Amino acid sequence: MRVLLSLVVILFIINSAFAVKINIGRPTKSHKTIHHETWVEEQTDQFDNIKVGQLLGFKRSPNRPKLQIKSYDPLGVQIPTSFNAQTNWPNCTTISQIQNQARCGSCWAFGATESATDRLCIHNNENVQLSFMDMVTCDETDNGCEGGDAFSAWNWLRKQGAVSEECLPYTIPTCPPAQQPCLNFVNTPSCTKECQSNSSLIYSQDKHKMAKIYSFDSDEAIMQEIVTNGPVEACFTVFEDFLAYKSGVYVHTTGKDLGGHCVKLVGFGTLNGVDYYAANNQWTTSWGDNGTFLIKRGDCGISDDVVAGLP
C-alpha cells in the first residue's frame, strides 16, 4: 500500500512539473480592467514581448516640407458641438473602415492614405481606396516600415500621387487578430511601379493626387476643417497606458513615452465635460473600441502635427 501511495505521489509531482513546463510562455489571456477618471483601461497580454516602438512610425523629418498653415475662419463653416464624418458622409464607406498596418511601422502612410481616400470620395465622388503599399514602398522622402513624416507623406501625394489598392494591394504580412499587433516585423519591400498581374489597370495612369496640402494652427481650425472637408491625419506621442485603451476619452495617465504614431481623425465632441477628438487606429478591430478611440483635445500632442489636403 505504501509503495502504491509513493508511486501516486511521484506521478503527481512529475505531472505537475510537466504542466508547469507546458504553460511557461503561454499567453495568459487574463484581463484586468482599470477605470480612470475619463477612460477605461483593459490590460491584457496583447502587447507582451512586442517591440511596440516598431509600430510607432511617426518620425519628424529635418527636411519636413513647409506647408500652408490654415487658421480658423470666423466667416467659414460654424463648428458644431459634436461631429462625426462617418454619419455626415454615409456614402463614403471608407471613412468607417479600420485598417491593419501589420508588421510595419507604416502608420504615417496609413493616416495620410486613409484621409486622402475619404476626401476623394467627399469632393470628387470617387469610391477608390488608395494604395498603402504604393506610399510605403515608393515614397523616397520617407523610410517605409522604418517610419516617416506625415507632412512628407502628403507632399508625396501632391507631387506623385498614389495608385489604387486594386492596382497595388498591401502585402505586408499580417497575423491573426488575437496576435495583434504582430510579433515580428519586416523590412520595407521594394518599390514596384507596376500593378499586380491580375489587374487591368496601368500604374502610371492610375495615380490620384492632392492639388493642395496644408497644416493647422489651432484645434478650432482642425475641427472646422473636418466639418468642411473630411477626416485629417494627426500624429501624437504614444505612452504605455495608451496600449490598453478600451473606451472613454483617453488622457495620458501613466507610463513612459514609446514613440510617435499617426491616425485618422474622423470627428470630435464632448463627453462628461472633456473635449475630445474621435480617431480610427490601424491596429485592427481587436484593439481599443473596435479599432477606434477618443482622445482629449491637445493631449499627447494630438493637435500639433495635423495635416490634410484637397484633390
Swiss-Prot record:
Keyword Acyltransferase: no
Catalytic activity: Hydrolysis of proteins with broad specificity for peptide bonds. Preferentially cleaves -Arg-Arg-|-Xaa bonds in small molecule substrates (thus differing from cathepsin L). In addition to being an endopeptidase, shows peptidyl-dipeptidase activity, liberating C-terminal dipeptides
Active site: C107, H261, N281
Subcellular location(s) per record: Lysosome
Main location: other
GO terms, biological process: proteolysis involved in protein catabolic process
Keyword Protease attributed: yes
Name recorded for this polypeptide: Cathepsin B
Species classification: Eukaryota, Amoebozoa, Evosea, Eumycetozoa, Dictyostelia
A GO MF term: cysteine-type endopeptidase activity
Protein family membership: Belongs to the peptidase C1 family.
Residue ranges the record assigns to the propeptide: 20-78
Sugar attachment sites: N91, N198, N290
Disulphide-bridged cysteine pairs: C92-C121, C104-C145, C138-C191, C167-C195, C175-C182
